[in-house]
């Protein structure tokens, strides 16, 4: 009988010890959770401006001309160039780069066929009316030509255009020029300093009629054989894309 009582007492002691251990572990877990809940989280570093960026890819697959002299002639297929196709490829890469960094960027034209300038302008101005013209910018991507594209020409270089007069577009062009001068070392940068800045001024419909800051870039001459080789090269494409992406970001950070 005495042995049985001793066994019962020992079992009771073990049960109490186990309950004490379990309670201590539960308290430790509670304290740990409280500590985790009280951790100071890093502040958000998202300082991206709330600006809608439109990237316009000039022309369409039904736009006449707009091709290099050798295109479709089978002379040197590696020098075939169709502006609408190249514009879209570059615009898509600019879009992807900015989108990947969290910017609100849109492709103005997603159709393959040429969309009228009036419709392009309407799309931009509709957004301007929704969010405010100071919250929208437009960059229209093109490649230049000195003639009809049937013969090789001597004209070369990169340039950007704004509408006539002093406008907020001039500032956007200024940042694009700054990047072009860094990225296109040894290549011609075409400027017009007659009005005190580097960009060229023109009454291009898409610049004159949009309500927001707008710049049209002419990314070298596709009817100059040296310029064409450059913009068809991996390095040339990379630098054209980088110029637009960095120029846009630097402009947005400055306004």
Segment roles from a protein language model:
Residues 59-62, 110-115, 143-149, 165-168, ...:
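Solvent-exposed loop/turn segments at secondary-structure junctions
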Residues 117-134, 204-209:
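Mature extracellular/periplasmic domains of secretome proteins
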Residues 54, 140, 144-147, 191-255:
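Active-site-adjacent mobile loop/cap segments within catalytic or ligand-binding domains
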Residues 50-51, 100-106, 131-138, 185-186, ...:
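Loop/turn elements at helix/coil->beta-strand transitions in domains of secreted/extracellular proteins
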Residues 1-26:
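Short, low-complexity, charged amphipathic interaction modules
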Residues 169-197:
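Active-site-adjacent substrate-binding region
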Residues 88-95, 118-121, 157, 169-177, ...:
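Extracytoplasmic/secreted envelope proteins and their assembly/folding machinery
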Residues 32, 37-123, 147, 154-156:
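Active-site histidine-acidic residue metal-binding/catalytic motifs
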